[in-house]
Amino acid sequence: EAPKINTEERTIWDERTMLAALQTIENPALHLAVHLSMILSLREGEILGLQPGDLDFDAADGRGTITVNKAMQRADKVALSKIDPSQIYHIFPDQREGSSSALVLKKPKTKKSSRTLYLTRPLKEELLAWLEKLRQDELAMDGRYRNCGQLFRLPNGMPVAPEALSKWYRTWR
């Protein structure tokens, strides 16, 4: 007989609890990521796979939509060489020389994972403010900004890695 796994049932937060939690997050990138996760039930890789072109603020009679059709993950370079290239959109340049892994933008695991979701007004406003912040970051870097094309970027324009987002989340929690 297989060993039994103890699983803890997660508590579903009501709107008040969710809003209270969001108010405690000071990191703007983490705030947006948690907001996307709470409202749209997006996973970490889906959040980091988002690009500005996935946002349509005029769709749904101005309510706005977000299309989820990519995921970001860190992959071992040896394993990466064995993956079907049609599943990979982009391999980001190494940030550390000699790294054995790479950040990869890839297709989601299943066709059902690709979907278009409606935005709430507060989420739409936060996304618009975030895009403005990215524009300001680029201007502040005075030609040194390296726009990776992702919605979640570091102030220098490079992508936020899943392990960075996880670390921010653990620090907040």
Label each PLM-derived region with a short phrase.
Residues 1, 41, 103-105, 138-139:
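Intrinsically disordered, low-complexity segments enriched in polar/charged residues with Gly/Pro
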Residues 1-52, 60-63, 112-113, 125, ...:
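Basic, Lys/Arg- and aromatic-enriched nucleic-acid-binding interface segment
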Residues 2, 17, 50-132, 147:
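Conserved tyrosine-mediated DNA breakage-rejoining catalytic core shared by Y-recombinases
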Residues 3-9, 128, 159-165:
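Short, solvent-exposed polar/charged micro-motifs at secondary-structure junctions
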Residues 6, 107, 111, 152-154:
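Short amphipathic alpha-helical segments at helix-loop
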Residues 20-30, 40, 117, 133-173:
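Short, basic (Lys/Arg/His-rich) helix/loop patches that form interaction surfaces
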Residues 33, 57-58, 63, 130, ...:
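Alpha-helix boundary/interfacial micro-motifs
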